[in-house]
Amino acid sequence: MKLIRRWGLMNSLMPENVAEHSAQVAQIAHALALIKNKKFCGELNADRIATMALYHETSEVLTGDLPTPIKYYNSEIRSSYKDIEQKANDSLLAMLPEEFREDYGRVINVDPESYEHMLIKAADKIAAYIKCVEETRIGNKEFSKAKQTLKREIDSYRKHEEVEWFCATYLDSFSLTLDELD
């Protein structure tokens, strides 16, 4: 994962790889689950969600990082790419010793209708937005449109109280330098 660069169609001043992105998504997903549990009486397994998030891009080991405009160009491409991702995950799981396949399968193949999946998707969008914030903060205007698009996508997740709380409490701090943090 560390060899797979993200944002392939963008001139990134701070390159990011899939391993770095996955770690940040896991941290954010873990935070969202903890917020749900501590602030809003949730009963989520935050550690399991963090682990699922850590592996959310596993298929990219074989597929690479397909740029978002291509992946979401139309429903037919999106559906076909979902199939490719599943085949890649299945191939990777088949490479494992038999006794590990079920355990890894449970964290790699997350039910797309589950609350956990939604939280990981929200965390994924937040992490991508943070990347855009970082790039635009240092003057890279190439990330401006992606930043606006991701902000709108995050807003659609704000109906979930833990996402709203995370965004209201933490999101603005990602645009600050270390010296600006209080």
Show which residues each predicted segment covers.
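Alpha-helical, largely C-terminal catalytic domains
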Residues: 1-182
